[in-house]
Amino acid sequence: MQQGAVYEWPDHAERFRWRTLNEGSCLEVLAANDEILATVYRDSAALMGDAYGVDDPVVLAEHQAGLATLSTTHVSLMEPWDSMLVHWKGGGSLDYVRSTAATKRIARNKVLDFGGNPEWNHEAILMASFRAFCIYPFGNPLEGVTWANDMPVVPILEYDEPSPLGRAEWMKALAWLVSDSALDEANRVFDGVAARYVHARAQGLPREDSLVVLTGSVEQGLWSAPNSRSFVAQLLRDAGARYALSGEMRQGNVELSLEALYAMRGEVDALGLVLYEPDTANLTLARWIESNPHHAQILPSSGQVFAANAVTCDYFGWWVAHPDAMLRNLRHVLYGEGDGATGDQSPCFKWLAP
């Protein structure tokens, strides 16, 4: 923390904050250990007015407009405050973008296609004009590219937030990159999301004991699951469930042997999954068990498995920006609470039929 500076923290997010010192203001992007990964200034005047000099400042292209995105999640965090996505100039992995507004802009050639990992279209990135290029730090396609040294690259760490509301609140950081009026709209939208989330969380459970839920997937013969500080674990707690790995405080995913997981079968009431299954008509519990020889070993004794199929549910997009709807959906699945209404979106989480 810089002495004499004024810090403004978001309400729920932990990976960014604003700092003001003298006449300079900036956005600081933070790692989990509070290391500053990037210091972002809206223009050169803000940089020059900051009495606290920083190494490698990111100065937005003040004479350009709009944002370029590396992740489809970034687009979904723009849409709540920019319903027509007029500030979206280009992006990667466009085949995975799901929103109607986004696909319309793509169809009208209003958005440049940057390709996707590993075949990034550097020519399209170079041709694009934008205020900032929003990336996730572990997949920067411009790493080591000399002509991109002065490009305003901003790491977006929504995926590393330990709460659903923290993830969604990154819509404010993206809006700040555009303008004060965009930030005002993002604040208004997010306040509504947060109020609905808190209301859903405050509802009592329709049963005396909460369900114990495990989530994760089989990777290279091990079970890989979110830790207890992850947004998934927090979502389950807010839905009234108990996360089966609540004692795991380590950073990153928790890896368990399948033998250890098998021993837990009797302690787990339900298994929660995120899948990508194109054959949606035949997505059943039996089909999931058949898809991997290990799945039969880890099936809870109850036989209950619920899943979000990323083919039909925009799990990494719309639902990130609308955690209130995700919470209502999950509470409805686990406890039959309410009607699980999610606006014009189909429910994301569903029990797998036998």
Question: What is the predicted role of each segment?
Answer:
Residues 26-34, 38-139:
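A short, structured surface patch at a secondary-structure boundary
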Residues 251-342, 351-353:
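C-terminal soluble interaction/assembly domains
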Residues 72-73, 83, 93, 138-139, ...:
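Solvent-exposed coil/turn segments that connect beta secondary-structure elements
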Residues 1-63, 339-354:
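N-terminal hydrophobic or amphipathic helices and topogenic motifs
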Residues 199-286:
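Flexible, glycine-rich surface segments
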Residues 84, 149-152, 239-240, 301:
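Short, structured coil segments at secondary-structure junctions
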Residues 61-66, 123, 127-222, 246-247, ...:
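Extracytoplasmic substrate-binding proteins
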